[in-house]
Amino acid sequence: MNKITGIIAEFNPFHKGHEYLLNQIEGIKIVAMSGNWMQRGEPAIFDKWTRAQMALACGADLVVELPVTVSAQAADFFASGAVDILKNLGITDLAFGSESAIDYNEIADIYEKRGEEMESYIQSLADQLSYPEKTQKMWQHFTGIEFDGNTPNHVLALAYAKAAAGKQINLQAIKRVGKFHSLELTEGFASATALRQELFSLTERQNLLTEQTNQSVSNKLVLTDLSAIKNHVPSAILAAYASPKTNWAAYFPLLQYKIRVDEHLENIFQVNQELSVRLKKAVKSAKNFDELVEQVYTKRYTKARVRRLLTYILLNIPKQFDLPEQIHVLGFSKTGQEILAQNRGKIISKIGQNPWDNLTQKADEIYQLGNVQFEEQNFGRKPIRSSIR
């Protein structure tokens, strides 16, 4: 049986650490990638097609899309939805980066045997604790794992282990290089956070210089000089970093409008009456997205949770929804095409008059408003074909 390894990723954006991860994996590599909205509650810096192209250029064989109701979820639900998609495509292994060197297969075995007891333990914990805090206490209680508060990949890896329990998937943890959310562009392996910050900083400086020299600015979010980041990005995809990009600033006026005029925010996914009141009050004074998050979050409602809630509000995600039955393909190599042939009835390669997932497609329409240079994200788009593998 051929080894087929799944990777769950955002590639926001793709960098040398991601290239390193792909290079450590043998056999066929299937990536389940977030579309245009991220797990931490933010729009992707580059659209899903650009990021899929980056992944294919650096060794992925098949890139499929996580629907927005999976990609913008908390860790456990994000992991569960992504693992289910990959398992449906026949993966034998799941690879991921982690700051920890523990055996995640043992963790999955523990959860398979004691999962019901572990979930009951979470329910017994005090309500004032956030869900991530409850989850960490659960892992500590049943496995002895310790957390230092600065291991986000380790937290996700535990969610993957939980999602993979009982599914006959071998878990392959690859030691992470570089710091996950470091804001500094260190030599070699820079974090996605640092790259996003640097990209927008460079763009602002470029636009200021352009205006000072009386040159026309066709788009405020296009970067042409990539020399400052070339040492931190795989050479094969450096040019793609000049693609149109966006961030929350582009959507904040839309979000303000939505919060102000919607009299029933509690009908939005995971928004309750308490949060609705807090949001209605905070939006009157918040000058930007970060200020709004700062004013709304509490110990119980973490910043990450608030960012996701604001994403649900902007995208009008209802409390009840169904996940799409088919899997949307963004791109494939020659090897990946063989996997598609084996899963013909499970995949959708082109979205036309018959929709794939209405919520994701509407979310993509809103995403397109973030930059006038974004192309149509779904209707008529065909998967990217890579000739590399």
UniProtKB/Swiss-Prot annotation:
EC number: 6.3.4.-
Source taxon at top rank: Bacteria
Amino-acid positions noted as binding ATP in the UniProt annotation, renumbered to this chain: 8-21, 97, 153, 176
Compartment(s): Cytoplasm
Pfam families: HIGH_NTase1
Any coiled-coil regions, as ranges: none
GO annotation (BP), single: tRNA modification
Reaction(s) catalysed by this chain's protein: cytidine(34) in elongator tRNA(Met) + acetate + ATP = N(4)-acetylcytidine(34) in elongator tRNA(Met) + AMP + diphosphate
Gene Ontology MF term list: ATP binding; ligase activity, forming carbon-nitrogen bonds; tRNA binding
Keyword annotations of the record: ATP-binding, Cytoplasm, Ligase, Nucleotide-binding, RNA-binding, tRNA processing, tRNA-binding
Entry GO CC: cytoplasm
Segments passing through the bilayer: none
Enzyme kind, highest EC tier: ligase
PANTHER family tied to this protein: TRNA(MET) CYTIDINE ACETATE LIGASE
Purpose of the protein: Catalyzes the formation of N(4)-acetylcytidine (ac(4)C) at the wobble position of elongator tRNA(Met), using acetate and ATP as substrates. First activates an acetate ion to form acetyladenylate (Ac-AMP) and then transfers the acetyl group to tRNA to form ac(4)C34.
Protein family: Belongs to the TmcAL family.
Record protein name field: tRNA(Met) cytidine acetate ligase
Lineage: Bacteria, Bacillati, Bacillota, Bacilli, Lactobacillales
